[in-house]
Amino acid sequence: MARRFATRVTVSGTTFVRELDGILEYRLNTNGLQILLTQDPNAPVAGFMVTYHVGSRNEAIGYTGATHLLEHLMFKGSKNFNKENKKTIWEILETKGALVNATTWNDRTNYFEVMPKEHLGTAITLEADRMRHAHIREEDRQSEMTVVRNEFERGENNPMEALDKQIWALAYEAHPYHHSTIGWRSDIEKVPIARLKQFYDDFYWPDNATVSIVGGFDVKEALAMIVKEFGKHSKKKGDYLAMYTEEPNQEGERRATVARAGNTDLVGIAHKVPAAVHSDIPALIILALILADGKTSRLYRTLVDSALAIDVSTNCYQFHDPSLLITYATLASRTPHQKIEELVKDAYRAIALKGVSSTELNRAKRSIRTYIASLRDGPYAFLSALNEQIAAGDWTRFVTFPKKLVQVSAKDVQRVARQYLIDDQSTVGWFKALPQI
């Protein structure tokens, strides 16, 4: 995907919006479907993704996990592609060498296929069919509920996932980032099929979706196929249900302890950071890399090299709404939780007070350049990265954001550490492993 092509064409039923770094944006005139196309005529494969602008942030108590459960149900068949007529997605595409899957997260859901390019039309037809004609049936809910519940239980048995879930639930009192994408167990088990159908009808429409194609395809032919298949759907009648809940200001440190059977002790420290499109996010990402990216990072040298911890990571999440920067440390045997917490906070304070060196800054930027190169390493990598920017609210960040990362200065890093890594704005979590009986 190193070479970039931008063959702008005119196709009846679509409106060209703009081109940016080889990505063509169109709109479907009849229903507002957003279309993003990146062509490489020499590629033997094509990637196709439908990103719905709905995720767990659009759920509420009683139907948490609805987006994820619907993801499972939408593979159970649709009007023209189902097991009854022996035209399931698996029989039609996987048998032809396609990679077929879907993912759900806080701000989006996507369905995708990566396949030999001659089968792109089939993927377009199939995804258009289940956009508005998916089978949402009680018998499928019952069977898939047990699959999803097993996923939930695996997460509960993973110390890191269990602690992470607790930290997000404590950091957010009001905003739906409070609950994880998989939902609460009782909602998974008991949500009525009528509620899932309502959720589907609330959000799964062309004017709440983005279609992306990457790789080997003809732009004119692809647009014509999208017009033919997705143009069958109208835009939604009425407004979408807005997610208008804002998290109130935090007034003091919050703490949680998860104590359960296990063999791993953990410490997690989270701080609120702005939404993905905020101008401070590039500096916060560089800060996270300086803290815990690789064996020369500050926290690795402080915690792992000293044998106090066996692993450490820091991640700045980039979501549609204000999110979290979190550091996790996996403790070595007999290391006190309090010791790790103090050392992490000391590292934060040191950067806020004294800043970072040019060596640290340059090392972080080298890591960023490697990551940026990986974003175009094949159709799925490209689609996945583009999808996250769509979810954040601005797909053009896929092109513009890397430049902002390499422009971050040492003063920027010190400033955001001082502004956001404040104890009174933190959520601290400890996982204490109890003896297994």
Language model: regions and residue ranges:
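Short, conserved secondary-structure transition motifs
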Residues: 149-155, 245-260, 366-375
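Short, polar/flexible loop-turn hinges at active-site or ligand-entry regions and domain interfaces
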Residues: 76-83, 131-139, 356
